[in-house]
Amino acid sequence: MRTRILLVLFVFALAVAGCGSTVAPVSVSVSAVEPLPAGATEFTATAPAAGNADCDREASWRPGPLPPPGAMPPGSTMAAIAERGRLIAGVDQNTDLFGSRNPATGQLEGFDIDIAREIARAIFGDPDRIQLRVVNAKERESVLQSGEVDVVVRTYSITCERKDVVDFSAVYYEANQKILSAKGSGIDTAAGLAGKRVCAVSGTTSLSKLYELNPRPKIYGATTWTDCLLMLQQGQVDAISTDDAVLKGLAKQDPTVDVVGDSIAKEPYGVGVNKDHQDLVRFVNGVLEKIGQDGTWQRLYDSWLEELGPSPGPPEPRYKD
């Protein structure tokens, strides 16, 4: 509408000038408003359901002794995977440090990618016997339930709500939800988000935690964290809030932003598994115990996450049986 009015004024000015008037030339300026990335929207509804608050979200199924690679128990979920010839893992391609595509090689890489490869190694003796299936945050439960993937290793925070529909391994990494804002913006605490526009990816626990802030910010959901960063760069939001590990990856892409504030919430990451495949959950927990004890977890941390600070060491597993 504004553009149409400006153009009418411009045409009128030309007409006046054509009649011999001494009216000065009219300067026309059309302001371009960048559209939100595809799938991004402002949320005004109430907070998502929290699920069974009484569950122990970090407790998983205790592993037994790991079978040798290539010798999975007959009739097990792992034997079916071995018969297929590859592990299918749902992963991310837009989260630097955990799961992103190397621009030089085109290969997916990161801490989560290597955790998935260790599961493949334990089944086949070869970490390359794996198919990496890119899934977005909102697809994680559905691809597990449908059997499209065997596991999801995608900065997947364990929650009671999610445990109602899928199963999880023990915790393999614990992150903290923080804030990413422009340097000098004055936004450096959760309280500073009051009334501000904040982006988080739809379907994530980060989004849920923003609803709990009081006063509440204006919450925007996007499809990927890269979209959130684009919205911050274009001035469409004032901050991003999610796990510090994810925010550090975004900050590497833009030197004008910084990770700030104390922890808003703890975010324990687990490997997602179909709820009917308890044997695979126990197997994955055996793999996590093994790589925690033999130094592999620490090697992966040093390779991908060292810039996050001193290693906390592999999380202590907690089991419910």
Spans of model-derived segments:
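Acidic, polar ligand-binding/catalytic clefts
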Residues: 117, 121, 128-192
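Bacterial signal peptide processing site
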Residues: 20-23
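Extended ligand-binding regions for polar small-molecule ligands
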Residues: 37, 41-72, 204, 271-309
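Short loop->beta-strand "edge-of-pocket" segments that line small-molecule binding or catalytic clefts
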Residues: 88-91, 109, 190-206
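Extracytoplasmic small-molecule ligand-binding "clamshell" domains
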Residues: 30-152
